[in-house]
Design a protein with these regions (language model features):
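Active-site hotspot residues in diverse enzymes, especially metal/ion-binding acidic/histidine motifs
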Residues: 1-115
Length: 115
């Protein structure tokens, strides 16, 4: 299943494109907190999916960040991109592009674009 299909599948299953509602249905943990030098990040810890979002962002930006981090949750669960970004010279651009595509596909359907 490609990235767009995965996002569309989630939207159909949960009958919404609201990432906060989908995340709740997935029993993932969502944490709003003041973050420094980052807008949001995903963590897989002790078999829990946790998404942290900067509480100071406007709600529409929080929604995009939530969808973006969900992309990491579904596409890159085993990749420790925070570690790769801060402790190695590995390029994580591909992961970020894929998470952006997932977020855009989740938030905006083909029908919405056609209108």
């Amino acid at each position: 299943m490609d990235i767009k299909q995965k996002a569309d599948s989630l939207a159909r299953k949960y009958k919404t494109r609201n990432p906060f509602e989908i995340l709740q249905g997935l029993n993932a943990i969502l944490v709003f907190a003041p973050l420094i030098d980052t807008r949001a990040f995903y963590q897989y810890f002790q078999r829990n999916n946790i998404i942290y979002i900067d509480e100071n962002l406007p709600r529409h930006e929080q929604a995009f960040e939530c969808a973006h981090e969900m992309g990491h949750m579904f596409l890159h669960k085993k990749a420790n991109t925070i570690f790769m970004d801060t402790r190695t010279e590995l390029n994580t651009c591909r992961y970020e592009r894929e998470a952006d595509l997932f977020a855009m596909s989740l938030l905006v359907s083909d029908d919405m674009i056609a209108e």
